[in-house]
Amino acid sequence: MSIFGRIKRLFLSPKSHEVALVLGGGGARGIAHIGAIEALEERGYVIHSVTGTSIGALVGGLWAAGKMKELKDIVLKLNKKEVLSLMDISIGLNHLMSGEKLLTVFDQLVGDRKIEDLPVNFCCSASDLVSGKETVFRRGSLKMAMRASISIPCFFKPVRFHRHIYVDGGVHNTLPLNRVARIKGDWLFAVNASAPDRRFAPAFVSKIRKHREGKFGKFLDSISFHN
């Protein structure tokens, strides 16, 4: 059977409807996670656990909290003016935006909900600048966990939370396959919205990356993450 035939059979005739879902990073491309979740649900799959990082943590967390419709409405209504309204410019040594407006939106959507109180198993990851390791949030404030996981270095202000300083989870683990909760007989679905493999990029793109990784990379290395 061809690969396309296998994929068709997978989606149309599932032997098990239980799914463990992993949503990776990818910036704005991660909005595709919304469509992936809808496609699974339309085909009768039941997502029993979801793990995400960066934009995947945002989409996965809001889905787990039952706020997918609200998230989709926000995305569909986004225009240039709406995007600019969320950009709270606050230039510092380590960031361009404070991220407080995003946190306000999260608060409006999920309030003080705890991860352990969600109806499905959810976790997300962030990168700890103090220990230099990946941190996985399985308990505690959902909105703070999501905010920490999407803190793109140099764009959003790092999050100080429980005596740690966090930035985007994708720094350590772009697609956290090793963090998702599994049950016997379930399907594992992973959605990778990150940039394509650079080996297949056009030659001029490779030249741009080489230049950026030289000078810009040294600039990033010189930045100290502190207030």
Predicted regions and their residues:
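Active-site glycine-rich loop that binds ribose-phosphate moieties when present
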Residues: 107, 144-158, 169-176
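Conserved small-residue
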Residues: 26, 36, 56, 124, ...
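Non-catalytic peripheral regions of patatin-like phospholipases
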Residues: 2, 15-19, 68-105, 127-141, ...
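Catalytic nucleophile loop
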Residues: 33, 46-64, 173
